[in-house]
Amino acid sequence: MTGRARARARGRARGQETAQLVGSTASQQPGYIQPRPQPPPAEGELFGRGRQRGTAGGTAKSQGLQISAGFQELSLAERGGRRRDFHDLGVNTRQNLDHVKESKTGSSGIIVRLSTNHFRLTSRPQWALYQYHIDYNPLMEARRLRSALLFQHEDLIGKCHAFDGTILFLPKRLQQKVTEVFSKTRNGEDVRITITLTNELPPTSPTCLQFYNIIFRRLLKIMNLQQIGRNYYNPNDPIDIPSHRLVIWPGFTTSILQYENSIMLCTDVSHKVLRSETVLDFMFNFYHQTEEHKFQEQVSKELIGLVVLTKYNNKTYRVDDIDWDQNPKSTFKKADGSEVSFLEYYRKQYNQEITDLKQPVLVSQPKRRRGPGGTLPGPAMLIPELCYLTGLTDKMRNDFNVMKDLAVHTRLTPEQRQREVGRLIDYIHKNDNVQRELRDWGLSFDSNLLSFSGRILQTEKIHQGGKTFDYNPQFADWSKETRGAPLISVKPLDNWLLIYTRRNYEAANSLIQNLFKVTPAMGMQMRKAIMIEVDDRTEAYLRVLQQKVTADTQIVVCLLSSNRKDKYDAIKKYLCTDCPTPSQCVVARTLGKQQTVMAIATKIALQMNCKMGGELWRVDIPLKLVMIVGIDCYHDMTAGRRSIAGFVASINEGMTRWFSRCIFQDRGQELVDGLKVCLQAALRAWNSCNEYMPSRIIVYRDGVGDGQLKTLVNYEVPQFLDCLKSIGRGYNPRLTVIVVKKRVNTRFFAQSGGRLQNPLPGTVIDVEVTRPEWYDFFIVSQAVRSGSVSPTHYNVIYDNSGLKPDHIQRLTYKLCHIYYNWPGVIRVPAPCQYAHKLAFLVGQSIHREPNLSLSNRLYYL
């Protein structure tokens, strides 16, 4: 592949008639119809320069079957089936929150000028979208035939239209409410087509929002961007990193939504990381690294759960299984009933020659059903030789050089990000075909980033032991300020084990010596560990643990020669379930650098203290009698994508002690079941610690997938309310439930001296880019050393507390300061990160519920 080509636009920007902002009134109605248009009417110029790298025949049309979408029937990604509502349209939670109906904005903090990656959508005056229902007599089943028959009358409906086989959208109103026309099939059969006007839709209707997004996807296709998942990428402008066998496709995320005062396009830079090796290449390499009789089992563990890209159609699939009984010569039944081999199918359909005839077949299960209440289509059967691995392995993520070389291209500064986003908007304004499409629909986009004002909250004071510290808000960490200061609460280290291998004896002694140096300043009393040498085998570690760990053992430290997952998992599983004891695993090489060994020993000592029940630092929290709950989910790929929900709750006023439980859920289920059990246990733990009950409970719910908000409101919140009613007569605490979302495409830039910079930590945004039907806000809480900072979105879906928006926002920011694995401000409230760590440990390593005797400790850090 060649290096990255420079983008070039042709054509002149066309003048626009006087336009009005779309969505300047924020009236939304629940429920909408999903419009599904035809493909773009014409090809535009390439977005980016350079020759196309698709294979010959790669754009061939399917003859009744698309193998990558299952074998039973054709599946069209843009127009097929009923889509999940990823943006939770129609979920209006603010209407039930009386105290924020009039205003949901706060006022505390210093005003700061910001801009964001949003562009207003404008339309010509009195714009409307006209929706028609199309009937055929006699009935025509095939959607393509329906389209061909209708489009014989483009002189009536015009060339600008969107049609899904039943519903037609036009930018104009036909003369008659009901119009009848006649068409002929190729066989000469007469067909009567009845076109009935069913809706005249205003610009802000939910149906129009869906329509805008589909039209915008059409524009991206005109610019020759390829859809992969939900985003669009430019395969003709690749960034090649040959030293690591990686390729990056640059692209964009896009969505058009109703925000506070207008409908806007939100677009951000996205990068798709591909590997230069196919799945078959990976299997061959892996075969030479493993024992032959274990190959199938081991390679399945490596591949299942990974996402692959099929370049012949630029689609991605998750590998759910490997069918070792099939190979390219195996046959399957096509939609027309005929049988064909994989070999022949790929040759005819995509001009792809398969060379290895003994390779197995990858299986990818579909996620979406066909239509409302429909059945799942058959699995996609994929050939390893034609599938490219995407993303990074754990080994790559831990390789400093790989991540550094990737970051050069993917970690963009605010100004670089604005420039790339601006490049897309420039193309939209300069591409003749794109402008023609927009002009026909009567739509256009602003050229400039949206600007508005945000607020910077007051910097928090950190209390550690008897001392109080300020920190530099620009860096948002206090590792230097608190070094050498006593902790809030310490546990004496009297009875502990240090297990090491012979070659790590020096590192083990060095660790103990440095722990003796750093612990006195923390206030920790420490005795020398019981040191035990073991062979560097998993079984040897387990045997020593079984023989040496007793009820009096406070903590076990294992010094490991490498970060081998199987060894780590076995140690954690035994000490978290069979023999509940806090544990700390340390890779020996991290102790090898003399210049950092003291800092690492300090961090290890802090973690050990936390895991034994100690407390490090706190911030001022004016709210009293309040329990904070954090919930997050992890999908365990090794157990059929079973989900684990981590549940963490504060059990003291200072929010320095935490109770934890986890819940196992069915395959792919995101929303938590069994919340009652967790909350009841947490309230018992609170009562045991304080001898009274909390009067407020504030839940931060992370790990909610796009489109699941309605289920959360209707299903999970009632579980909390039912649980509180069951505690006892007369107990009626105030409840607040806040959905936390890290994966957002919104970016904010601070304007300083004519340059764009990252906003300072503590920046709150609750205007312009929030949703009118929600009680929501953004906070930029952390600082980043390079690239662009990502905000976190908070959506208060239930609240009978009566707390002001300022109080909720400031509490949320305070909670980002008390995560004990990092002496600084993190991106989400600490209970969310604790819940994530718990769910991750259980899903990655333990695969069972941890022993309940560990519930009151941060053993999962």
Curated annotation (Swiss-Prot):
Residues recorded with modification Omega-N-methylarginine: 14, 49, 53, 370
Keyword line: Cytoplasm, Developmental protein, Differentiation, Disease variant, Endonuclease, Hydrolase, Magnesium, Meiosis, Metal-binding, Methylation, Nuclease, RNA-binding, RNA-mediated gene silencing, Spermatogenesis, Translation regulation, Ubl conjugation
Effect of residue 217 to A: Found in a patient with azoospermia; likely pathogenic; requires 2 nucleotide substitutions
Subunit structure: Interacts (via Piwi domain) with DICER1, suggesting that it forms ribonucleoprotein RISC complexes; this interaction is regulated by HSP90AB1 activity. Interacts with MAEL, KIF17, PABPC1, PRMT5 and WDR77. Interacts (when methylated on arginine residues) with TDRD1, TDRKH/TDRD2, RNF17/TDRD4, TDRD6, TDRD7 and TDRD9. Interacts with CLOCK. Interacts with MOV10L1. Interacts with ANAPC10; interaction oly takes place following piRNA-binding. Interacts with RNF8; leading to sequester RNF8 in the cytoplasm. Interacts with TEX19.
Record protein name field: Piwi-like protein 1
InterPro entries attached to this UniProt entry: ArgoL1, GAGE, PAZ_dom, PAZ_dom_sf, Piwi, RNaseH-like_sf, RNaseH_sf
GO biological process, alphabetically ordered: meiotic cell cycle; piRNA processing; piRNA-mediated gene silencing by mRNA destabilization; primary piRNA processing; regulation of translation; regulatory ncRNA-mediated gene silencing; sperm DNA condensation; spermatid development
Organism taxonomic ancestry: Eukaryota, Metazoa, Chordata, Craniata, Vertebrata
Primary gene name: PIWIL1
